[in-house]
Structure formats: structure tokens, C-alpha cells
Amino acid sequence: MTQDKQHKNDMYGNIDARSESDEGVLPPIPAATVVLLRDSEESYEVLMLKKNSKITFGGMWVFPGGKIDPEDYGEESDLEYAARAAAVRETKEETGISLDSKDFIHFSHWTPPPGPQKRFATWFFIAKSAGVKSVEIDEGEIKDHQWIKPSEALAKHSAGDIDLVPPTWITLHHLSLYEKLDDVLGHFSKAT
């Protein structure tokens, strides 16, 4: 009997064999990301960033974001407040784009299954880029960027041209169901 080949993006392995209480299971690290959207001539686009191949999620295409730092809480003890602050901070660090967390729409929250690998419990927000003229990547953590239609990003992933982690793929899939940016924002504004 042959063993199934593991897909290169399968970082979770056999999730049915583990639980949070197992020895060696690392606790999830709180994190946040912003799915930044803009109108385009045909439809709308999402900002994707390519991670440096030498760091966590190396070579993957992701949305701007990162872990929640203690200072992101400010005087608040609210995790969503801290997640929004982290998303603003990380987006500025990675792209040079300044955002206001009041413009964020809560989209989803992902926590990977238990395991020995580093894992992030991530808040996903969506926001419309208002007047963003340029993206200034840091050339350290981030090596490339692209504004792309969600359906085109999925097609590139399917062709093996870009790598996506499962939450990014699913987010792009949800977005690809909408033709216009106003429809995306309208739907998810009502859903939260």
C-alpha cells in the first residue's frame, strides 16, 4: 500500500490525532491581518504580499498583518481592540500604508489545529483602501506585493505559481463570489 503524498501547503498533518492538551502542542499566538481591497476598472483587487522565504510562512502570499504585541492593547484589555491596533501597525510596517481601524469590518477568525508548529490565532478584517497611491514593502519580511483580483490569485495558486495557506485561500474564495467591491463591503458589514 502506498502512502498519500503530503501537499506542500499541508502544514498541519494529521489533525485528528492531536488535541490542545497533548504534550508538545504549542499555544496559538494572537495575530491580526487586514484584507485590503480597492476598486479596479473591471472589478476590485486585493493586496497580497509575498513573505521572505527565510521566515515563518516563507514564500507564501499573505495579507498584511502579524502577531499582536503587548503595546497593541493600549489601556484596553479587549482582544479585538488589540487585534485592530496590531493590524494597523503591521500594515504600516509591511507596506507603508496608514489605516484607521474604525474602517475595518470583522471578516473571520482562524485558529489552526493543535500541533508542535508555531500557529497563529488570527483576526481577519477587511477594509477599503482609500487613496492608497503606492505600496512600500520593507524588503526584509516582505519581498514582493501585488494588487490582484481574488479569482486571479486563486487561479495562480491552482497553477502552482503562488503558495497560499488555507485561511488565505478560503478568504480569497469568499471574496471571489462578489463582482463589485461595494457588494463585498455591504455583505460583510451586515454579517458582523
Which residues are covered by each model-predicted region?
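N-terminal leader/linker segments that precede catalytic domains of diphosphate-processing enzymes
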Residues: 1-142, 146-192
